[in-house]
Amino acid sequence: MREWVLLHYRVPSVPSARRVYVWRNLKQLGAMLLHDSVWVLPYTAWTYEQLQWLAAEVEELEGEAALWRAQLILPGQEEALVARFVAASEAEYAPLRDAMAAEEPDLADVSRRFLQVRRRDYFDCATGKEIYGILSAAREE
């Protein structure tokens, strides 16, 4: 069974910049929205630390935040959640595959974007490995 870290938060609706700030940070981490304001990431020391910092920022923004470590118990739930994370990573990698198929791909740009997506690819999806191989081969040419 995997462990997960969950963040539940609430920030004042006005000004909306506070909510947008928190949302952008969660998206940048690759967190998945479970329900309303409950977000989840696979538990690692790094994801836990990032959500601790974000929870502290929520409180500085005059909001409330709660952070949990949890396990999914019912059959199939964990697999479904992992599948959501993998699908999100696959969707982020797709434009990189397209960029590498161009006549003269911008390797620096694709590499930079690859590293950004790779940081959110918590389950090492197949497309990420494929893009890495394509980038490695292109650099050797």
Predicted regions located by residue number:
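Positively charged, polar, low-complexity stretches
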Residues: 1-100, 119, 135-138
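Glycine-rich, aromatic-bearing surface loops/beta-hairpins
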Residues: 113-141
